[in-house]
């Protein structure tokens, strides 16, 4: 079959392990979703900063794509204690 070609109407993308996510009930490669996006609101995992991910509740780390022409990154949950501590300290200072 075609990678990322499956439907995600009733179940999530099976191809998430190869970097695919659901958009408009069809699975697409994450970088394709990001490249074709008009705004960050086009997909819940699109971001331009770590704060975007935290605000959306979809992670705490915005990872850019290697292709510099793609203006949006992809949200992930970073489990590093150092990362979480750094953010906590930053928020403590600014609030």
UniProtKB/Swiss-Prot annotation:
S-S bonds: 4-20, 8-22, 13-27
Name of a matching Pfam family: Albumin_I_a
Processing and modification events after translation: Contains 3 disulfide bonds.
Positions of transmembrane segments: none
Alphabetized UniProt keyword annotations: Disulfide bond, Knottin, Plant defense
Keyword Magnesium attached: no
Propeptide residues, chain positions: 31-95
Distribution of this protein across tissues and organs: Expressed in stem, shoot, root, leaf, pod and nodule but not in flower and seed (at protein level).
Cross-link Cyclopeptide (Gly-Asn) placement: 1-30
Alphabetized PROSITE patterns for the sequence: CYCLOTIDE, CYCLOTIDE_BRACELET
Domain notes: The presence of a 'disulfide through disulfide knot' structurally defines this protein as a knottin.
Name recorded for this polypeptide: Cliotide T5
Origin organism lineage: Eukaryota, Viridiplantae, Streptophyta, Embryophyta, Tracheophyta
